[in-house]
Structure formats: structure tokens, C-alpha cells
Design a protein with these regions (language model features):
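N-terminal glycine-/serine-/threonine-rich phosphate-binding loop
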Residues: 1-54
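Internal alpha/beta core interface subdomains
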Residues: 2-5, 94-200
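Short, basic, glycine/proline-bearing loop/turn elements
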Residues: 3-7, 70-77, 121-122
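General beta-strand structural signal in soluble alpha/beta enzymes
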Residues: 9, 30-35, 49-53, 78, ...
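Short glycine/serine/threonine-rich phosphate/pyrophosphate-binding segments
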Residues: 16-17, 84, 134-136
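Short, flexible coil/turn micro-motifs enriched in small/turn-prone residues
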Residues: 30-31, 57, 127-128
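Glycine-rich nucleotide/cofactor/substrate-binding loop typically near the N-terminus or early
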Residues: 36-107
Length: 200
């Protein structure tokens, strides 16, 4: 069993998140987030460190670059049982991130709105291609040995059930299960983007 101590939360849809955040907070899990998600967490009364404070780098390019930083991805990808990784984490002051919760930009829904002849433009659709979120999903899923990845709001109740049973601890089998779901989400998302570009 591995304990969840720090959670990075970066979601588009906030509905259904509050119950999960409450349980994590009750278990003493520390939150790390950006933008609207950070404001949502703080609005619930929980402390939340800004990713910008961790990286000492602001969100740039109209929000296109927020979490893409070695201090974030190093904290997710670092192998906890690898001495070299641990030495570099200490050298560069990289915190361990044990849980990543992501809900991607609604690309397919935006395309569907455009297909219904709404005022959605091609640029609107392109801006809904998630970069940071999909990168977080893949990084956390790759390191499922140490990290829990919740890749969509559909998985919020799954993690909540585990937390209610075990506290802030997960098994390797549970982390692998989440990783499998995560690569499914990633594959589906990229397939939708490929299909749209193929039709454009």
C-alpha cells in the first residue's frame, strides 16, 4: 500500500469533485493546483498551493502553459525506489506528487457544438485540445507504481470508494487499474482529435 500525501488537481469540470476533495482533505492530503481549479478548492475552504508558487513561473500564453514544468513532471515521474531519482529530487527541490486528478478540456463536445451550426470557430475547437492535462495523465499513468491517476470525472467515485475503505492508501493493483483507464482516456481523446483533423 502507498499513501497519498500530495495531490495535483487540474480539471475542467468541477461537478462531483467536492466530495472527493473533502475526503482527501480529511485524510491530510495536500493540494496543488492552477487557475480555476485552485480557486474552486480554496472556495471550499481548503488550502491549496499554486503550481506557479512551486515552479516560480507564471501561467503563460493565455493559459496554454501552466503545469508543463520539471518541478511538476519530475514530482510525478520520479521513481521512489530509485536512488538517482531521489537524489535529483532533493537537488532540485522537487516534491513527490502521489495523486493526479485530471478532467480534460471538452474537445468532442466543442466539435459537436460546431457541427450543430453554433458560433463555434475552428480556433475555438483548437483551443480545446488539451496539452497539459493529457501530459499529466500519461506521466502519472506511466509511473503507476508510485502515483494514482484519476483521468476523468467518471473515476471520482471510484477513488472515493477506495479512500472510504482504506484511507489515503492504494494498492499496486488499484493504481494499475487507474493507469489502464487513463491510457484509455488518452487514446480516445487523441482519436477524436485525429478524426476531426482528418475531416477538416
Amino acid at each position: 500500500m502507498k499513501r497519498i500525501k500530495t495531490a495535483l488537481v487540474s480539471v475542467f469540470h468541477k461537478d462531483g469533485l467536492d466530495e472527493l476533495l473533502k475526503k482527501l482533505n480529511d485524510e491530510g492530503v495536500r493540494f496543488l493546483s492552477t487557475g480555476g481549479t485552485q480557486q474552486f478548492i480554496e472556495g471550499l475552504g481548503y488550502e491549496c498551493q499554486k503550481v506557479e508558487d512551486l515552479t516560480t513561473y507564471p501561467s503563460i500564453l493565455g493559459g496554454r502553459v501552466k503545469t508543463l514544468h520539471p518541478k511538476v513532471f519530475g514530482g510525478i515521474l520520479a521513481r521512489r525506489d530509485n536512488e538517482g531519482d531521489r537524489e535529483q529530487m532533493a537537488q532540485y527541490d522537487i516534491p513527490e506528487i502521489d495523486l493526479v486528478i485530471v478532467d480534460l478540456y471538452p474537445f468532442e463536445q466543442t466539435v459537436a457544438m460546431a457541427d450543430c451550426k453554433s458560433a463555434i470557430t475552428e480556433q475555438d475547437i483548437i483551443e480545446k485540445i488539451d496539452i497539459g492535462g493529457i501530459s499529466l495523465i500519461r506521466a502519472a499513468a506511466k509511473n503507476f507504481n508510485d502515483v494514482v491517476i484519476v483521468p476523468s470525472k467518471a473515476e471520482y467515485p471510484v477513488l472515493l470508494d477506495i479512500l472510504n475503505r482504506n484511507g489515503a492508501q492504494t494498492t499496486i493493483e488499484e493504481r494499475r487499474m487507474f493507469a489502464t483507464k487513463a491510457f484509455g482516456v488518452s487514446s480516445h481523446y487523441d482519436t477524436a482529435i485525429h478524426q476531426w483533423f482528418s475531416k477538416s
